[in-house]
């Protein structure tokens, strides 16, 4: 049975990164893909469950494309698109970035859950 797509939340950081890396059309395709396949990205160690997906860019393919960092908890929360970067910019998140993501994840869960209960 097909499940409905997951809601996507684009963070300010992701939007800034995406604006310089990904066209509007490619961003829409990315969002549709992640919404339908929220577990597609590989888990990044030491981040509390943050994932990274390789996204092909026109003329560059997956290996020269963008890396999109996102968090998916479960179907009760949206997918949070956190950041994006070109493979030519860096290979992986730094330890400081991984630590920041690990601190961000519980805050996302708590803040979103509290906001949902208030409605």
Set out the residue ranges of the language-model regions:
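Compact soluble domain cores
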Residues: 13, 22-42
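Basic/aromatic recognition patch in beta-strand/loop cores that engages polyanionic ligands
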Residues: 40-85, 89
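A generic structural signal for short beta-strands and their flanking turns/coil linkers
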Residues: 10, 30, 47-51
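Residues that form generic nucleotide/phosphate-binding pockets
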Residues: 17, 33, 104-108
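Amphipathic alpha-helical transducer elements in NTP-driven molecular machines
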Residues: 24-27, 63, 98, 102
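Enriched for short, Lys/Arg-rich terminal
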Residues: 4, 72-119
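Arg/Lys-rich, positively charged N-terminal/basic patches that mediate binding to nucleic acids
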Residues: 1-25, 118-119
